[in-house]
Regions:
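General alpha-helical segment detector with a strong preference for membrane-spanning helices
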Residues: 81-85, 167, 182
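Conserved small/polar residues in nucleotide/adenosyl-binding loops
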Residues: 175-181
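Histidine-centered divalent metal-coordination motifs
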Residues: 77, 98, 130, 176
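Short leucine-rich amphipathic alpha-helices used at interfaces
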Residues: 90-91, 96-98, 138, 144
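Glycine- and charge-enriched loop/helix tracts that form the active or gating conduit
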Residues: 1-75, 79-93, 101-115
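Histidine/acidic-rich helix-loop-helix segments that form or flank divalent-metal centers
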Residues: 44-61, 115-171
Length: 183
């Protein structure tokens, strides 16, 4: 039964109206993944984020291609932010270490949902590395490619683009997503 529910859930998050359905039925989705409730109405309180955490997550999910691993990555990539939130003297929130916290929470979720090992491993790597900023650095690109491999590194760039495009109107440059011309 769990396998059937998850199969249908993966179809849902890859469907054409995934964002609308996930938003409209978020409480129902939370029956399957209760950990997502921390994202509902969570104010990120940062100039780089104009959406609450749930809306940011849905916007990013809707931006990326409908591949189950990529969509699950986007659904869970920031789930650890509420756990690591700090506020500086100016009132801005920061989320240092949220990548590893999100990976830890996602690991529990994905194993509980009994997803295949390869699916879990790729999703967790994408979550862990989703905030790496290459800025054209050959050295960093080689390091990441040694861990992820070429195909997963390409998917990582898609994840980063979707994540950044779902943040805010604050001026941002996508140049850090550019691969070095030669490795």
């Amino acid at each position: 039964a769990t396998e059937r529910v998850i199969s249908e859930f993966l179809k849902l998050i890859c469907g054409q109206d995934a964002v609308k359905i996930l938003d409209a039925y978020r409480e129902t989705i939370a029956v399957i993944i209760p950990e997502i409730t921390v994202m509902f109405n969570f104010n990120q309180n940062n100039i780089h984020h104009s959406y609450d955490l749930w809306q940011h997550t849905l916007t990013a999910l809707g931006t990326i291609e409908p591949n189950p691993i990529l969509r699950m990555t986007m659904l869970l990539h920031d789930i650890g932010k509420p756990s690591v939130k700090t506020t500086d003297n100016s009132g801005q929130s920061h989320f240092q270490g949220h990548q590893l916290e999100s990976k830890k929470i996602a690991d529990r979720i994905l194993h509980r949902l009994r997803l295949p090992s390869d699916f879990i491993n790729k999703t967790l790597l994408l979550i862990e590395y989703h905030d790496v900023r290459f800025n054209g650095s050959k050295k960093l690109m080689k390091k990441v490619m040694n861990v992820l491999g070429t195909d997963l590194t390409k998917q990582l760039l898609e994840v980063e683009y979707a994540d950044i495009s779902a943040q805010s109107e604050y001026p941002v440059s996508y140049t850090h997503l550019t691969l070095p011309t030669k490795l």
